[in-house]
Design a protein with these regions (language model features):
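Acidic/polar loop patches that form or flank catalytic/metal-binding clefts of enzymes
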Residues: 2-6, 29-34, 92-106, 113, ...
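C-terminal and late-domain segments of enzyme folds
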Residues: 46, 72-105
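Aromatic- and carboxylate-enriched substrate-binding clefts and catalytic-loop regions
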Residues: 1-76
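Histidine- and/or cysteine-centered catalytic micro-motif in compact active-site loops
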Residues: 7, 140, 196-198, 224
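Glycan-recognition and catalytic regions of carbohydrate-active enzymes
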Residues: 99-192, 238
Length: 277
């Protein structure tokens, strides 16, 4: 498999060569302290038209001096902004790009990275204004998952087989599930919703009318906290409100008639995992 980084021009080669699963070809997360926060709301309409993009999301520690003592930069995003990118950006190989020790204090938020799928059969851009914000809903390739599960679940040594975290979530299996637990299982109806915004905080109303009518789902909502903010200038100075690691996690029952009212902090975002009960 090839996942090319730096300036490889995206021309849709992955459609000809399926082992070309993605490339960067964008100012990725390592530039997050210097680029306009609205950059990530533009890329779905520009760079991503040329194929999958490995943006290396998932940076929870935004103070760059923790990684490089000489740096005074602070990244311009919140934790929930980073979670939202796993949905708004398409890449069949996603990264958890931070140091493991930076995730340890936030394992409840890291759960979304474990649960989110990486390949989709349906993608819906629910609302967007390039340069300002974007909200995307995606549905994993459950038909392919079911075919894989049928084969893997029948392996003689299936109890030794590892089940990916995303597959575990889609099938409603426990954390310690093995390949043998997939036998006879069918994927539940699962959706993921992600949103990110620029330096302006905003509230969006997300209709869940893409869910199956008459079905009840459980939604886990990862949202910016009331005091969250990822807004900071290029020199690393802030207005005293910089609080990128503030977030809330709530669980609620939803249906196709539900509308979620979700707040995004400045440079913030949200992520929602939705699974049929």
């Amino acid at each position: 498999m090839v996942n090319a980084h730096e300036a490889v021009r995206p021309t849709g080669l992955c459609r000809t060569w399926p082992n070309m699963i993605g490339n960067e070809s964008a100012m990725g997360t390592e530039f997050r302290g210097r680029i306009n926060p609205g950059h990530t709301t533009i890329l779905p309409f520009t760079r991503l038209q040329g194929g999958p993009m490995d943006y290396t999301p998932g940076i929870f520690e935004t103070d760059m001096s923790k990684n490089a003592s000489w740096s005074k930069e602070k990244m311009r995003h919140t934790i929930c902004n980073q979670l939202g990118l796993y949905v708004t950006f398409y890449s069949p190989l996603q990264m958890a790009a931070d140091f493991p020790e930076h995730y340890e204090p936030f394992m409840d938020a890291f759960q979304f990275i474990k649960d989110v799928a990486v390949d989709w059969d349906t993608s819906i851009y629910l609302m967007a204004e390039p340069g300002a914000y974007i909200v995307t809903a995606r549905h994993p390739k459950t038909e392919s998952l079911n075919k894989s599960a049928e084969g893997v679940g029948n392996l003689k040594d299936g109890k030794k087989g590892v089940v990916s975290n995303a597959a575990r979530y889609v099938y409603g299996l426990p954390e310690d599930a093995t390949a043998a637990d997939l036998k006879g299982k069918k994927a539940k109806d699962v959706w993921y919703v992600g949103g990110v915004t620029d330096e302006n905080g905003r509230v969006v109303s997300v209709k869940l009318d893409f869910l199956k009518a008459g079905k009840t789902y459980e939604a886990v909502i990862y949202a910016d906290g009331k005091d969250a903010s990822g807004l900071v200038n290029w020199a690393g100075a802030d207005d005293g409100k910089y609080n990128p690691q503030s977030y809330t996690i709530t669980t609620k029952k939803v249906t196709s008639k539900t509308t979620l009212k979700l707040k995004m902090a400045p440079c913030g975002g949200f992520a929602v995992s939705i699974r049929e009960k």
